[in-house]
Amino acid sequence: DTDRSRGLGDVYKRQVFVDIHDEQAVEAAINEKTRVIFAETIGNPKLDVVDIEKLAETAHKHNLPLVMDNTVATAYLVRPIEKGADIVVNSTSKYINANSDAISGVITDSGAFRWDKEKYPGMAEYAKFGKFAFTAKLRNGLFRNTGACLSPQTAFYNLLGMETLGLRMERACDNAKKLAEFLNTYPDVTVN
């Protein structure tokens, strides 16, 4: 059985885009069909930073998992699960890899979200795996159907990049701070 229902098609049928910083807009967009709240830790391309704790509070109030894309920040700068996110995704091809010589990604499940069988019927058969239910669903459906399996060479490239991740992220932060301080001296440059 490799139909769409085995992947995440049963979860991601329709996307609604809202200003993730506008609490009222987020609340207004949530209805009985909403299944997940997805946001980027640091948005691309605006580089805006989301309040993960506030977003997690909103998601959990409505019994929704909060999925954070942490590609730009990486776990070196921000650990979304510690701030209330349920699932974190990263494109490792960017900062983690360092050289963009391999295409891959990582999904990290906190195991904290309790999948309601009524709201998420596709998760019912995975309830027996407890906190690993979402991971089991990914493995049985998405990974099996799309061939999402990291090759040894790609893993090697990612590990090489991780050796310098800390240094690179510190330098990026230092450079960003210096640039912001420099631009702050120009009255024609404003931050909205």
Question: Language-model segments: what does each one mean?
Answer:
Residues I37-E40, L55, D69, P80, ...:
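Buried hydrophobic positions in well-ordered alpha/beta secondary-structure cores of metabolic enzymes
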